[in-house]
A protein has these predicted regions:
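Short acidic (Asp/Glu) and glycine-rich catalytic loops that position anionic groups and cofactors
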Residues: 9-14, 38-41, 80-86
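C-terminal auxiliary extensions adjacent to catalytic cores
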Residues: 72-120
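Intrinsically disordered, low-complexity charged/polar segments
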Residues: 47-70
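Short, conserved micro-motifs enriched in small and acidic residues
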Residues: 20-28
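Predominant activation on well-ordered alpha-helical scaffold segments within soluble catalytic domains
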Residues: 31-38, 59, 102-106
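FAD-binding beta-loop-beta segment adjacent to the flavin cofactor pocket
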Residues: 1-21, 63-78
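Generic secondary-structure signature for well-ordered alpha-helical cores
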Residues: 39-43, 63-67, 107-114
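Internal hydrophobic alpha-helix adjacent to the cofactor/substrate pocket in enzyme cavities
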Residues: 27-49
Length: 120
């Protein structure tokens, strides 16, 4: 899920070649590949986003799908792990997915001491 080439940790992929489709997947892939390349150059471990956020779920899909059945994928709610409790209302369910994603991503970024660069 780091977008690194298996045989060369200093080579990163992004865009359609990774198996993502759509503008969101392409933008996310480029952003994650760029951040992870920078982290590698700084001697830090690459980010592995939690699968409970859409970016992490999409990266998890493209790295864990069966090669013989692989289909390119764009961001969609079906990629996210189910909630612990079933929520019947779509609006409430999607709000719960979003809240869980924000919480898990924030906790992960704090854990790895990720601080975005400030714009000058």
């Amino acid at each position: 899920p780091t977008l690194q080439f298996r045989d060369r940790a200093d080579l990163f992929f992004a865009g359609q070649i990774t198996g993502t489709e759509g503008y969101v997947g392409s933008a996310m892939g480029g952003l994650v590949a760029g951040i992870n390349c920078t982290r590698l150059l700084d001697g830090k471990a690459p980010l592995t986003l939690p699968p409970t956020c859409m970016s992490g779920a999409l990266l998890h899909y493209i790295t864990h799908a069966e090669p013989k059945d692989f289909q390119p994928m764009k961001a969609n709610m079906g990629l996210l792990p189910e909630m612990a409790e079933r929520i019947r209302s779509k609006v409430e369910r999607y709000a719960a997915y979003a809240a869980r994603a924000r919480h898990d991503l924030h906790a992960y970024l704090q854990q790895v001491s990720f601080v975005p660069l400030a714009a000058d």
